[in-house]
Amino acid sequence: MKKIFQLAIMACTALSVHATDYTRGLSIWFDTPNTLVNKAIWFGNTSDMWKGETKPESAGDTATNPDAGWESQSLPIGNGSLGANIMGSVEAERITFNEKTLWRGGPNTSAGAAAYWNVNKQSAHILDEIRQAFINGDEKRAMLLTQKNFNSEVPYESWKEKPFRFGNFTTMGEFYIETGLSTIGMSDYKRILSLDSALAIVQFNKDGVAYERNYFISYTNNVMTIRFKANKPGKQNLVFSYEPNPVSTGKMETNGNNGLVYTARLDNNQMEYVIRIHATAKGGTLSNQSGKLSVNGADEVIFLVTADTDYQINFNPDFNDPKAYVGVNPSETTATWMKDAAALGYDALFDAHYKDYASLFNRVSLSLNGSGKTDNIPTPQRLKNYRKGKPDFYLEELYYQFGRYLLIASSRPGNLPANLQGIWHNNVDGPWRVDYHNLSLIHI
């Protein structure tokens, strides 16, 4: 009887780490893991043509992202400044990382940025000629009239010019967390994005151990928090590493026995940025060597990540000043954020994060046809069924709420608005430079 009681306790303990079923709430989830096949996608393409840069990159200036898994199966999290995509592979977690103000390139004109504002203010009457050219089917004349009369002193840009005149949003690199595990013998895999709490979760069972990872980016503390845990002690054997943006030059330094600081500048415009990483472990050992944080035999591990650039928002810039948008010391800002976040710990960070996020997300609820969630299946299966004509009002509710989630995660007070991809990108360059556009009428 005593033995049966002990086995029952062990069984309950084995389930405790997965006690919360995040798929039951408003969530997007998958039941198969991703792989590392497209990690650091920029190294698999053509060489860069920008003057002074020789490192490999992919321009990615088409509508097709070369990393299809990142685009369709990763879990996006963000706080309006920092963004990350969680891939959720078992062998090694891959996290693409972004900071909204990291911008590659610039005006690229000897006259300076002010030249862009020197436009022909007496061009309205030319509109009649342009319209008539279109009516006559003379698109070439319409284009030439537009370029000549509705442009600044800076020559009209060519889509394929190198460097592109206005530059582009660019990745801040990728993080990898090697686990020493494999998918052999793995079961009950789930990769979940909880829209209710802006929390990403990875869960699976392996060799009788229930593993769980949690990820969120806090607006209140400007830090990404990552937690690895299991239902049995001593199971966390991890190596945390960083792959930097390939068109930047930087240096990784240790910060005590549990921290890393990467300081860099983009190669073409010298924008400075800093990334700070901090680790804490319950049990086991933690070492810091060769730009990597290694954990052995820990019960639980917390990684904190924050970043910043030298960009300063300026609503009244002097365009003759090349430093009009420079004014932040990213080494100082990131040090303050990291110190404050590390002092709080996981629970306090998540509580503040959830309270802030829920105050926005919970303003709106949506119920279509009084449906509710009638079945609990992975999101790809929902989409597959929907394409076959099966009604799914919950999927439509989820789609609407996912849009709200993405905007909250990519646009918050105190920073730039969301760009064409919100705040998330996995490459050096991207479709339409991942920049800022007014909405075209054809897209409405």
Protein language model features and the residues they cover:
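Bacterial Sec-dependent N-terminal signal peptides
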Residues: 1-20
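Aromatic-residue-lined binding/catalytic grooves and analogous aromatic/hydrophobic interfacial grooves
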Residues: 20-441
